[in-house]
Amino acid sequence: MQPAMLLGLLGAAALAAVSSAPVDNRDHNEEMVTRCIIEVLSNALSKSSVPTITPECRQVLKKSGKEVKGEEKGENQNSKFEVRLLRDPADASGTRWASSREDAGAPVEDSQGQTKVGNEKWTEGGGHSREGVDDQESLRPSNQQASKEAKIYHSEERVGKEREKEEGKIYPMGEHREDAGEEKKHIEDSGEKPNTFSNKRSEASAKKKDESVARADAHSMELEEKTHSREQSSQESGEETRRQEKPQELTDQDQSQEESQEGEEGEEGEEGEEGEEDSASEVTKRRPRHHHGRSGSNKSSYEGHPLSEERRPSPKESKEADVATVRLGEKRSHHLAHYRASEEEPEYGEESRSYRGLQYRGRGSEEDRAPRPRSEESQEREYKRNHPDSELESTANRHGEETEEERSYEGANGRQHRGRGREPGAHSALDTREEKRLLDEGHYPVRESPIDTAKRYPQSKWQEQEKNYLNYGEEGDQGRWWQQEEQLGPEESREEVRFPDRQYEPYPITEKRKRLGALFNPYFDPLQWKNSDFEKRGNPDDSFLEDEGEDRNGVTLTEKNSFPEYNYDWWERRPFSEDVNWGYEKRSFARAPQLDLKRQYDGVAELDQLLHYRKKADEFPDFYDSEEQMGPHQEANDEKARADQRVLTAEEKKELENLAAMDLELQKIAEKFSQRG
């Protein structure tokens, strides 16, 4: 039975091996494998000494095993490749991706066709030949190449978007329309054609730009009509200042054109920047123009230093540009509500122009960023901007000079610093006129925070103002009080100056007692007898009570002191103080009463008292009964109960005597404890 079972098992194994072996159209390999398996089985069963596998059979079996492994690898790689294709979505809008697909189209199609043919062979015959596997392995690089190109395209797209964002940040918010026109001309001359995306974007931004320009023009026209109808004198002064500004603007424009030409010669322009500049100018036009007169100075200052169009700055330069624009925005918003129109302050316009010019030059090419020698006027302006205290002093010193330019500049400064704690009486006539004019135009003064005022004024000025304020309208001794008070401390010093004969305690004695006693003495007496006379000595507001001897209700202070005040907090704090001062009883047992022992035996004394009362009640029942009058019914019941009581036996009497003796002993013990306590 055993050889038959072995033969059956070996036959089943042979069939399984034959079915798992690769079948290639029932060719020679299958036959060789089956023969080898049968030979091995027969040799193993018949002859134990003969080697079971011949070298030829061994080679055939090795080949079949390699083919099976190769097919499994091919299947795994096919599935991986299909998953990768699903994960990498194709972007139909990208031109580069389309071209890369056209280049790699033929090998991809061939590989797909061959994989399909290979799959058909596998389904029909149950396996693959070695040649199919080799073809598939040769096709693998083309598929990997396609996926790599797709990834490269996506990374390039991301880099392009980030570059556009950086360029959008770098360009200043207030670039003028003329810069965009120059850039268009330059792009047409150089022959660079923007792509379709930038064309669409530039068309949309141009439409929005025209709409915003129309709105801004309408708004400026309304403001012009209002200002012209209300004030004619301001127009005349504006014309004079414009005449002075025109030559300056022309020189600034010439400088800006030279700078832009140098930048254009140095670097080439990039695609798609036209649309971004249009959008940047559109954002600035959407901003509401609160002051029509101010817009002229902004315009001229931006025209004076335009950036060259074709520049791609580094990330460091972009960060510096962001910081500069934020500073400009903060400065503009701070001075928004209390500056004069640029027509009336030419010096302020020049100052802002030079400041912005310095900010913008830091963003240009290396030639523009080279340090240029500054004139003495620009250095003085920077010093004034950084040190407003010295500016105020200089304006006060120059007040005697009578030139028109200095008057207008001082007037602008006076109005700018109005509401910031200025000294009374300076430029009062000018301020009233300008206030009326600004209120008519709808401008309101903005109050400055105390931190800004403290920064602007030096310490000496603050002290002088305080002294003037304290001595103002006061004569004789009162003026001396305030001066002495400045030398002394706050509230206490005032009272010491006012009442020099009084005696003051450094700290209330009762408070000291409370704190020290509660902390260091666990047996601190909680009943504190407060003396209001001592406590009120330190309070100057109650001085009149000491003189009169009575308070408002007519009760004297001595009557108030007759009642103690109970300290409830002491009992809550006591356990904590016991834990802290655990060795206090050993150190000072002679002074402190032993309250703990007394408390322990209070219960024993109470029990003794109750027993005593019980004993007395047994001896004199009629005396210790309740005092309520008993009714006739209750009296009859009591008489019946007494009649029912039987006479006590000798044993019961002995028990009662023993109980009485125990009661007496307990009473003696309680008396001893109470005497000790």
UniProtKB/Swiss-Prot annotation:
Residues carrying covalently attached carbohydrate according to the record: S93, T115, S237
Signal peptide bounds: 1-20
Pfam families to which the protein is assigned, alphabetical: Granin
Keywords, in A-Z order: Cleavage on pair of basic residues, Disulfide bond, Glycoprotein, Phosphoprotein, Proteoglycan, Secreted, Signal, Sulfation
Compositionally biased spans, kind Acidic residues: 251-280
Protein name, per record: Secretogranin-1
Keyword Ligase included in the entry's annotation: no
Bias (Basic and acidic residues) ranges: 64-90, 118-133, 148-192, 200-249, 306-322, 363-409, 421-455, 491-504, 635-646
Organism, as annotated: Mus musculus (Mouse)
Subcellular location: Secreted
Superkingdom, natural source: Eukaryota
Subunit description: Interacts with ITPR1 in the secretory granules.
Entry keyword annotation includes Lyase: no
Disulfide-linked positions: C36-C57
Disordered as annotated region, ranges: 63-505, 531-558, 622-646
Family of the protein in this entry: Belongs to the chromogranin/secretogranin protein family.
GO cellular component entries: extracellular region; secretory granule
Modified residues (Phosphoserine): 93, 99-100, 129, 147, 190, 220, 256, 260, 300-301, 318, 342, 365, 375, 378, 493, 532, 543, 626
Post-translational modification Sulfotyrosine, affected residues: Y348, Y472, Y566, Y624
Role of this protein: Secretogranin-1 is a neuroendocrine secretory granule protein, which may be the precursor for other biologically active peptides.
